[in-house]
């Protein structure tokens, strides 16, 4: 237990020299912001609801990167870590993986827009993608209120050639890395590429979700709605039925998505 000393300067009159009072406190007595002002404890508790046997080495590596991101002092890092964590946990929740078609469509339409300057296709792809994200948030809540049924559930799927495994990975990450100087993104790129090249469909889905999430316009949506996603993960981490928090997060995500301009 580290002692903390509080120094008080008190003047008895306008012209008197101040007297000094030193009070010693335990660091446990000092009031703190919720979650120490960081999101790392929130996402750590939410991760506890995912069976470790469902996590590959690559996913465990991503988990550690996101915990480090969530421990940073800037809001952007914490928001990104929270949103990515929610998506990954959701994809690990269903017993039978869905597909990554919505994410792949967002990625391909964005990289096409970067090359052509026409982002009409990208704007059209956002609705299905964020609808997919909203469905996934329901899966996170099921980890608390009905985990047994999740074993036999199927993740959200739109249906497309290859199940969303085929998209312009390198061009997408060129845009992602060019948009930020965060060292965490360089680490993520290496690990997400392993997930992308995996033969496991669940790993492929997670790679597509992370890649789509980090595209600059999509990341901005999650940046604006991160508070509601944090509340959801906090509720899940505390073992509460978070049905209302799911609806709140879905509403904020939809609102932020409607404001995307490219």
Curated annotation (Swiss-Prot):
GO CC, any one term: extracellular region
Keyword Signal: yes
Protein localization: Secreted
Location, primary (coarse class): secreted
UniProt modification remark: The interchain disulfide bridge is essential for the intracellular transport and secretion of fibroin. Partially N-terminally processed to yield a short form which lacks the first two residues of the long form.
Signal peptide: 1-16
Complex and partners: Silk fibroin elementary unit consists in a disulfide-linked heavy and light chain and a p25 glycoprotein in molar ratios of 6:6:1. This results in a complex of approximately 2.3 MDa.
Function: It is likely that the major role of L-chain is to prevent the retention of H-chain in ER by forming the disulfide linkage.
The protein's name in its UniProt record: Fibroin light chain
Native organism: Bombyx mori
Species classification: Eukaryota, Metazoa, Ecdysozoa, Arthropoda, Hexapoda
């Amino acid at each position: 237990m580290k002692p903390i000393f509080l120094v008080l300067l008190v003047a008895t009159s306008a012209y008197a020299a101040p007297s000094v009072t030193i009070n010693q406190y335990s660091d446990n007595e000092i009031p703190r912001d919720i979650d120490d002002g960081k999101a790392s404890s929130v996402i750590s508790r939410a991760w506890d609801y995912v069976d470790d046997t469902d996590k590959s080495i690559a996913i465990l590596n991503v988990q550690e990167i996101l915990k480090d991101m969530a421990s940073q002092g800037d809001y952007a890092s914490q928001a990104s870590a929270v949103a990515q964590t929610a998506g990954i946990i959701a994809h690990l929740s269903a017993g039978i993986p869905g597909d990554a078609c919505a994410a792949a469509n967002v990625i391909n339409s964005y990289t096409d827009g970067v090359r052509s300057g026409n982002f009409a296709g990208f704007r059209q792809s956002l609705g299905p993608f964020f609808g997919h994200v909203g469905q996934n948030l329901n899966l996170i809540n099921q980890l608390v209120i009905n985990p047994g049924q999740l074993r036999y559930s199927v993740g959200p799927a739109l249906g497309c050639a290859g199940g969303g495994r085929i998209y312009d990975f390198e061009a997408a990450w060129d845009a992602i890395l060019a948009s930020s100087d965060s060292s965490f993104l360089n680490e993520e790129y290496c690990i997400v590429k392993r997930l992308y090249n995996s033969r496991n469909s669940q790993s492929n889905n997670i790679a597509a979700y992370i890649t789509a999430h980090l595209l600059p316009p999509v990341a901005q949506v999650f940046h604006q709605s991160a508070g509601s996603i944090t509340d959801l993960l906090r509720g899940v981490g505390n073992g509460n039925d978070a049905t209302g928090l799911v609806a709140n997060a879905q509403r904020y995500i939809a609102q932020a998505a409607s404001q995307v301009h490219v």
